[in-house]
Design a protein with these regions (language model features):
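Long amphipathic alpha-helical repeat/alpha-solenoid cores
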Residues: 1-148
Length: 148
């Protein structure tokens, strides 16, 4: 099995940046585990967990070479649960804004922190507020891209 740092290098994260990325992602992974009500001592975070996220992003249209850029800009993404967080976020953004996955990927490339949104929590509340107060869907997207 490939190690964490080697895996990060394989997706375009330099060895010099890998320590910082791994440190941030590990901290977020523990927070995510606790948030789900699980014991962080029983959870492990390594290359296999990262690979699930990377596979999802590439399936959604992020070029493999650009995944490293996303990870450097927003290391926490490596710790997000694909089924519980990323897939629902993509589905929500695609359906709400009538944008396909590739369009959302372009938004994410401009603002990687969009991946930190939770579809069922902060994303929905922000978007509903903006739309209820007269913003168009395009204005709501632009707001998210400028402020997150």
């Amino acid at each position: 099995m490939i190690g964490e740092y080697e895996y990060l290098e394989s997706i375009g994260v330099s060895r010099a940046q890998a320590l910082q990325v791994m440190s941030r992602a590990s901290a977020v992974f523990e927070q995510e585990v606790v948030r789900r009500g699980e014991d962080p001592r029983e959870a492990s975070f390594g290359a296999a967990e990262m690979e699930r996220v990377v596979r999802f992003l590439t399936e959604k249209g992020v070029d493999t070479k650009r995944v490293g850029f996303l990870v450097i800009k927003h290391p926490a993404v490596l710790a997000y649960d694909v089924e519980g967080r990323l897939r629902p976020l993509f589905a929500y953004m695609e359906s709400t804004f009538e944008r396909d996955a590739r369009m959302f990927v372009e938004d994410v490339m401009k603002r990687p922190s969009l991946l930190g949104l939770r579809a069922d929590e902060n994303a929905r509340r922000m978007v509903e507020y903006l739309l209820e107060n007269g913003s168009s869907k395009e204005e709501a997207v632009e707001y998210l891209l400028r402020t997150l």
